[in-house]
């Protein structure tokens, strides 16, 4: 069965002024879609045929991994954003962030540093470790926390195609704008154990 490009969970212009309609048209409709097309061209006739996207990400390498992980990462990223996002988390997630980082502001500062400081194209992540603790991670290229057994809670895409139309080379400005869109309800669902399937 072929993989399909999931629709955005909001309209292309819904994240303005922080992320433009043009960026989403390129980022989702072209870049994300290209990974889907590539994956569908690579999988037939391999051991990965018939496997879920998550299974492929956890067990593949090379071109199949790169495209599968990028499909998964992007679908997860779109869900981390919302036109009604921003603000701060509440409840158990907020408590866990405070316990791990000292305060929400300190977490925000550290996550921003992790994302901005990712060398080249990659992703900044908040993850839940197997012992339930929270940690930050930076992955290069198509890197995905699923491969290390961590549970992704939040990601910021810092590939240049995520921000270049709107912010050019100013990655810090893009990450600053990202905070206005974070979908804390989605992040909380992941923290509480809801399994995300891309």
From Swiss-Prot:
It catalyses: 2 superoxide + 2 H(+) = H2O2 + O2. Its cofactor is Fe cation. Fe cation binds at residues 27, 74, 157, 161. It is an enzyme of class 1 (oxidoreductase). Keywords: Iron, Metal-binding, Oxidoreductase. GO terms for molecular function: metal ion binding; superoxide dismutase activity. Binds 1 Fe cation per subunit. Pfam families: Sod_Fe_C (PF02777), Sod_Fe_N (PF00081). The keyword Cell membrane does not apply. Transmembrane segments: none annotated. Gene3D superfamilies: Fe,Mn superoxide dismutase (SOD) domain, Iron/manganese superoxide dismutase, C-terminal domain. InterPro entries: Mn/Fe_SOD, Mn/Fe_SOD_BS, Mn/Fe_SOD_C, Mn/Fe_SOD_N, Mn/Fe_SOD_N_sf, SOD_C_sf. Its EC number is 1.15.1.1. Destroys superoxide anion radicals which are normally produced within the cells and which are toxic to biological systems. Belongs to the iron/manganese superoxide dismutase family. Homodimer. This is Superoxide dismutase [Fe]. The lineage of its organism: Bacteria, Pseudomonadati, Pseudomonadota, Gammaproteobacteria, Pseudomonadales. The gene is sodB.
């Amino acid at each position: 069965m072929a993989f399909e490009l999931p629709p955005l969970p909001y309209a292309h212009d819904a994240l303005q002024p922080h992320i433009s309609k043009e960026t989403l048209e390129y980022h989702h409709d072209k870049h994300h879609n290209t990974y889907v097309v590539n994956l569908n061209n690579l999988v037939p006739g391999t051991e990965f045929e018939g496997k879920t996207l998550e299974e492929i990400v956890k067990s593949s390498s090379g071109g199949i991994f790169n495209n599968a992980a990028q499909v998964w990462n992007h679908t997860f990223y779109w869900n981390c954003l919302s036109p009604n996002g921003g603000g701060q988390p509440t409840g158990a997630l907020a408590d866990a962030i405070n316990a791990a980082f000292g305060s929400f502001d300190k977490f925000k500062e550290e996550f921003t540093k992790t994302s901005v400081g990712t060398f080249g194209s990659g992703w900044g992540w908040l993850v839940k470790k197997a012992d339930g603790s929270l940690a930050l991670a930076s992955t290069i290229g198509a890197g995905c926390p699923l491969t290390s057994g961590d549970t992704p809670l939040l990601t910021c895409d810092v590939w240049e195609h995520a921000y270049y139309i709107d912010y050019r080379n100013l990655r810090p400005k893009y990450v600053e704008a990202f905070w206005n869109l974070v979908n804390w309800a989605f992040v909380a669902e992941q923290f509480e154990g809801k399994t995300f399937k891309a």
